[in-house]
Design a protein with these regions (language model features):
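RNase H-like polynucleotidyl transferase catalytic core
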Residues: 37-46, 151-168, 184-186
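Short, basic/hydrophobic alpha-helical segments
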Residues: 76-128
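Short beta-strand segments
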Residues: 14-16, 130-135, 157-160, 211-214
Length: 247
């Protein structure tokens, strides 16, 4: 379902995630150093607290919205998420076509196809305007947040258990962390927060769109087509075997 959301271009897709905690310790990175004189990091570690990162990412444009925080409780995450989503919705054009209630409900239910456990949709639904990919965390399933998303025309798409790799926000968070922290030794959580948000602002000056699958996926699919699966296990051969052929 999430892969289908990435592939379509009718509804905007945003992804949400949290990264961290990041500690006040040296982060390894790449340096130019004279031969025999490697970079030396301080061995002392003073516990000054940690920082986390809240992320909203739009793969189609590459735009990212980031906020650094000390804690990531629902009381902190939900208001930030709601404010950012309202700003995103305000920038979207109003739906050009007015659908009947039945057609509108089918648009929402289309994104629940194939799920074994489905969230109950409200009786009255606004026009569907945005798809939001979220990790399957308890904080993302609170009734107040889910009902707010529905009221705003946002359909949450939750990653399955062990399926966080379906959330493209994971990739942008890894990139921003490397740009912000690698090769540095932050002394305070506030310094970590400032560097993470600065890295996001720098990224947004020239964002790079993300695409699902791409050339690597096409190569993997071609490789699988050249393989011949065997029964009984996950084994395969590079040429077909005829079951009636004698050894």
């Amino acid at each position: 379902m999430i892969e289908a959301a990435y592939a379509q271009d009718v509804l905007p897709v945003w992804t949400e995630d949290e990264a961290g905690p990041y500690q006040t310790l040296p982060y390894p990175g790449y340096h130019w150093q004279p031969t025999g004189e490697p970079v030396r990091s301080a061995h002392e570690y003073t516990r000054e607290g940690t920082a986390k990162q809240l992320t909203l990412f739009h793969p189609a444009s590459g735009a990212v919205r980031v906020k650094g925080v000390r804690n990531c409780t629902n009381a902190i995450r939900h208001p930030w998420l709601q404010a950012e989503l309202q700003a995103i919705l305000a920038a979207l054009p109003e739906p050009a076509e007015v659908l009947s209630p039945a057609e509108n409900r089918r648009c929402w239910e289309r994104w629940q196809g194939g799920l074994s456990v489905r969230i109950t949709l409200p009786e009255t639904l606004p026009p569907l305007r945005l798809l939001l990919v979220l990790d399957n965390l308890a904080g993302h399933l609170t009734p107040s947040l889910v009902l707010w998303l529905f009221a705003e025309g946002i359909m949450p798409l939750y990653t399955p258990l062990g399926g966080s790799w379906l959330n493209m926000a994971e990739s942008i968070q890894r990139l921003l962390k490397r740009r912000a922290l690698d090769g540095h030794h932050p002394q305070t959580p506030e310094e970590i927060i400032a560097w993470l948000e600065e890295a996001a602002r720098g990224w947004n000056r020239a964002p790079t769109p993300f695409f699902w699958g791409g050339k690597r996926k096409a190569r993997r699919e071609r490789a699988r087509q050249r393989r011949h699966a065997l029964g009984g296990s996950g084994a395969y051969t590079e040429r077909p075997l005829h079951p009636g052929r004698a050894a």
